[in-house]
């Protein structure tokens, strides 16, 4: 029997689970907030695709230009979360989900896929070794344990990069107090607010 994957939309998200927290009742409020956030992000081209089972087998990605990650990757899709767990590992689900993201990138005329991973394995991030075996390349490594990987569709496209503030540890604003604010109803990446 062939695996069935579904893509969540504003129309079906209320009746579908989002994989992240269905096994932990303590996360109910966060779970509902994430669903609200997803509904807003779907309008920005965000995709949440999962196995049509009660399982943690899914991929989330969207336009890198709108990603909440300190990366410069114009015309790429940013993989934010990619998870295949438990008995579903080794069954081809990861490859199928990744291939669906590649197909979306090609259909949109994107230059490729990009993601941030732990240089050493972090339990909350994509598996760098697996992604490298799938054709991703390490574009940049940070000294404190994170790497930027890319899978180029357009080999002539410029490499993505971490924002300069990631390496320097300093924000661009130097006067007053800088506050980074994130609200669930905001559909644009968090922007600094400078208060003098």
What is the predicted role of each segment?
Residues 84, 90-105:
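Conserved acetyl-CoA-binding loop-helix of GNAT-fold acetyltransferases
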Residues 66-79, 89, 173:
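A conserved beta-turn-beta hairpin within the catalytic core of GNAT-like acetyltransferases
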Residues 143-166:
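C-terminal "cap" of GNAT-fold acetyltransferases
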Residues 119-141:
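Conserved active-site alpha-helix within GNAT-family acetyltransferase domains
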Residues 185-195:
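Single conserved hydrophobic/aromatic residue that forms the stacking wall/gate
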Residues 1-54:
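Short amphipathic alpha-helix that is part of the acyltransferase structural core
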Residues 54-65, 78, 83:
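Conserved beta-strand in the GNAT
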Residues 105-120:
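Conserved GNAT acetyl-CoA-binding A-motif
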């Amino acid at each position: 029997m062939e695996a069935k994957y579904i893509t969540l939309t504003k129309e079906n998200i209320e009746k579908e689970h989002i994989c992240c927290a269905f096994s932990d009742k303590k996360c109910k409020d966060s779970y509902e907030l994430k669903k609200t956030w997803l509904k807003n992000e779907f309008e920005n081209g965000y995709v949440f695709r999962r196995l049509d089972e009660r399982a943690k087998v899914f991929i989330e990605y969207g336009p890198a230009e709108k990603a909440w990650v300190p990366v410069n990757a114009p015309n790429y899709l940013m993989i934010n979360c990619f998870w295949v767990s438990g008995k579903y590992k080794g069954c081809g689900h990861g490859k199928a989900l990744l291939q669906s993201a590649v197909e979306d990138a090609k259909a949109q005329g994107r230059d490729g896929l990009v993601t941030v991973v732990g240089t050493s394995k972090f339990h909350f991030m994509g598996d760098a070794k697996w992604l490298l075996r799938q054709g991703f390349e390490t574009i940049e490594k940070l000294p404190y344990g994170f790497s930027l990987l890319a899978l180029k569709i357009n080999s002539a496209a410029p490499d993505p990069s971490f924002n300069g503030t990631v390496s320097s540890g300093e924000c661009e604003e130097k006067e007053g107090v800088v506050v980074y604010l994130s609200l669930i109803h905001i559909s644009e990446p968090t922007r600094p607010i400078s208060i003098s």
